[in-house]
């Protein structure tokens, strides 16, 4: 068998590559490397090249499907996975990939069916492969509104002792959707008992509780995070984010300043944001500009600066920063730049260009409902 891309476990894990399969063709190997590096467009090209060289190799179609999935081209991904299945191999990985693609298309019943087929095809594969898919199925059931079914799957993972920290958190999210705040908090506490320094977990839980309008429970989680003693510069940055969630801007500023002074550059993003909250936009802009001098290749800094300039109504200057940032941005950063670019042209009264930019944005992010509403608004202008 050839190398096959393995998607990660649950929504919280990154994609991984099978370590046990022997090497494929040279194009496939290069495609795998491109995929690992996040260069999905090139990965698609290379996997197609591998298929041209060996059109009967099912693993190449499976890899192509995963690369399409990573770009959000779910229908193309399903076609590739279907072709892999027709060639008679990679059934577990292809069914799993189809499930992920149907998830992306919000066709959750089909996703659940595909995940079930993957589970049945797992055979002698390592048990973690099957449990991964149980987690995906639980998520699809949750999105379909089958909360009891989702809990059943998550409880199976808990009984198996599988990735307990993440699973307890996801289980808590399901209980929130069922309006059972007490049970959700219990699951969150189980999660934090496993790792009480999981700052990202505190923030994610607080966000879920905010959406559930469970404000008191949200404050319990955030205040629990403040009881954790910060040791490293990054810890201080997380502490600042917790304070921001509690709307304690002065304390947040001090924490971000501590983090930034200790050498954690990303704290500068939040420090600038705090300046903006304090009405000190010039200080924010100066901070971002100073950071860019020290790290001119950081696309995130251009994003922060351009966003700040947009909020200040300095659209021409914002466009300059957007163009510079887009030259450095990876796929995960492009959405903000493209969105802000369309906003700048709209605010400047150039509606035709704004529509053109927004249509370009929607070609890459077709699921963005806010962008569709904005496009309809622009047409009305």
Regions found by a protein language model. Give the residues of each.
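Register position in tetratricopeptide repeats
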Residues: 36-37, 70, 104, 143, ...
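Start-of-helix register in tetratricopeptide repeats
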Residues: 25-26, 59, 93, 128, ...
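Residue-level recognition of tetratricopeptide repeat
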Residues: 32, 66, 100, 139, ...
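Short coil turns that delineate tetratricopeptide repeat
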Residues: 55, 89, 123, 162, ...
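Canonical tetratricopeptide repeat
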Residues: 29, 63-66, 70, 97, ...
């Amino acid at each position: 068998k050839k190398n096959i891309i393995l998607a990660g476990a649950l929504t919280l894990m990154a994609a991984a590559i099978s370590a046990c399969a022997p090497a494929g063709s040279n194009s496939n190997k290069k495609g795998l490397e491109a995929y690992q590096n996040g260069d999905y467009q090139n990965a698609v090209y290379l996997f197609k090249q591998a298929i041209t060289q060996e059109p009967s190799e099912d693993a190449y179609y499976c890899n192509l499907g995963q690369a399409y999935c990573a770009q959000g081209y779910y229908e193309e991904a399903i076609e590739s996975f279907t072709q892999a299945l027709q060639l008679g191999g990679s059934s577990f990985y292809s069914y799993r990939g189809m499930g992920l693609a149907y998830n992306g298309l919000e066709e959750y019943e089909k996703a659940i069916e595909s995940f079930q087929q993957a589970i049945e095809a797992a055979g002698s594969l390592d048990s973690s492969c099957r449990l991964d898919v149980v987690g995906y199925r639980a998520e699809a059931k949750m999105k379909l509104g089958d909360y009891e079914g989702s809990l059943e799957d998550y409880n199976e993972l808990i009984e198996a002792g599988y990735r307990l920290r993440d699973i307890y958190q996801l289980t808590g999210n399901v209980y929130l959707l069922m309006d059972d705040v007490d049970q959700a908090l219990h699951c969150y506490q189980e999660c934090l008992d496993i790792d009480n320094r999981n700052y990202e977990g505190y923030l994610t839980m607080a966000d879920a509780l905010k959406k559930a309008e469970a404000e008191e429970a949200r404050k319990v989680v955030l205040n629990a995070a403040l009881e954790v003693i910060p040791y490293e510069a990054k810890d201080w940055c997380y502490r600042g984010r917790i304070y921001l969630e509690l709307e304690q801007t002065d304390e947040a500023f001090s924490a971000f300043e501590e983090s930034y002074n200790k050498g954690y550059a990303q704290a500068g993003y939040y420090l600038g944001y705090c300046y903006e909250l304090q009405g000190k936009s010039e200080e924010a802009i100066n901070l971002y500009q100073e950071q860019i001098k020290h790290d001119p290749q950081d696309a995130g800094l251009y994003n922060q600066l351009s966003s700040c300039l947009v909020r200040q109504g300095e659209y021409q200057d914002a466009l300059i920063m957007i163009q510079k940032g887009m030259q450095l941005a990876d796929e995960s950063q492009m959405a903000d730049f493209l969105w802000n670019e369309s906003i700048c042209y709209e605010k400047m009264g150039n509606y035709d260009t704004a529509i053109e930019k927004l249509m370009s944005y929607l070609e890459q992010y077709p699921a963005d409902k806010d962008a569709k509403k904005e496009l309809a608004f622009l047409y009305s202008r």
